[in-house]
Amino acid sequence: MKKLFQNYNYDFTKNEKKLLSSFCKQSLRQMNGDKKFYAETKAFNSILTKLELPDGTIKFTKDEKTRLTYQIKLNVEQIKKQMDKSWFIKKWLMKSLYTQYSNLLEVHFKN
C-alpha cells in the first residue's frame, strides 16, 4: 500500500550539509542565467538557504526534494561512468566522492 503522506524533514550531519551546499552552489553556477532552468534555480536557491540555517532539522518541499534527488542520482551515475573509464589514480580520487553521494542518496533520499 502506498503511503499517503511523506515526511520531508531531514536531519543532516555537518559533513552532509557541506556536501549538499557545495553541490547546490555548483549546480547554481552551471544553471545561472539560463531561463530553461528557472524552476531548478529557484529550488536550489531555496535548498541552499535552508542548509545554511543553524537549525538541526531541515524541511524540504516536495518539489525541492524531487529536484535534489534527481540531480544527485544523475551526479552519482556520471561519477560512476567517469570512474569506469579512468585509470587508477583518478578512480582512487573519485571513489570517496562517489561513496559520499551514494551514501547520501541511500540514507536520506531512498524511495
Tell what function each PLM region has.
Residues 1-111:
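Positively charged, low-complexity terminal tracts
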